A protein has these predicted regions:
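Extracellular/lumenal/periplasmic "stalk" regions immediately C-terminal to a signal peptide or transmembrane helix
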Residues: 1-14, 19
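Periplasmic OmpA-like peptidoglycan-binding domain that tethers envelope proteins to the cell wall
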Residues: 27-41, 49-53, 63-145
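Short amphipathic alpha-helices and their capping/turn segments at secondary-structure boundaries
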Residues: 5-11, 43-52
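Short secondary-structure junction motifs
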Residues: 8, 55-57, 101
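Pocket-edge structural micro-motifs
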Residues: 13, 22, 134
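Structural motif
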Residues: 17, 57, 127-129
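Short acidic-rich active-site patches of cyclic nucleotide enzymes
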Residues: 17, 24-25
Length: 146
């Protein structure tokens, strides 16, 4: 995964999990949930790397800043936007036939888990992101312990 870092993607390991963070501008136009062509390319590369890890559970979280949306249609607020973004990321990733949809969970976190301040442009930009949280599937381990 390290080779994918940079250009809007960061990787952190903590508490036995791997966190992959994708900046909004890599994937989406502001306030939108449709993935752009650059984002599709990045997600396809990520899917290729993830496809070698069959024993992972992957939570895809959408995060927004705290600016309310003035949305109409399907996306009415930051909750909707964060969920739709997470879901669309998963839909691109699972186009890779080696990734099993059962490995994935989509979650919308809206503006409630910021990594920076929402009081300035740079902080809000940091908060608008997709995070993939990779955790080992421990089912086989638990079966051994029974």
């Amino acid at each position: 995964l390290i080779g994918l870092e940079g250009e809007g993607l960061t990787i952190i390991q903590k508490n036995g999990k791997v966190y992959i963070s994708l900046e909004e501008q890599l994937l989406f136009a502001s306030g939108k949930y449709e993935i752009n062509s650059e984002g599709i390319i990045a997600l396809n590369k990520l899917a290729s790397v993830l496809s070698f890890q069959e024993d992972l559970n992957i939570i895809v979280e959408g995060h927004t800043d705290s600016i309310p949306l003035s949305g109409k249609g399907m996306v009415k607020d930051n909750w909707d936007l964060s969920v739709m973004r997470a879901t669309n990321v998963i839909k691109v990733l699972i186009k890779n036939p080696k990734l099993n949809p059962i490995q994935f969970t989509a979650a919308g976190r809206a503006e409630f888990v910021p990594i920076s301040t929402n009081k300035n442009i740079a902080g809000r930009r940091d908060n608008r992101r997709i995070e993939l949280i990779l955790t080992p599937n421990l089912d086989d381990l638990f079966k051994l312990l029974e």
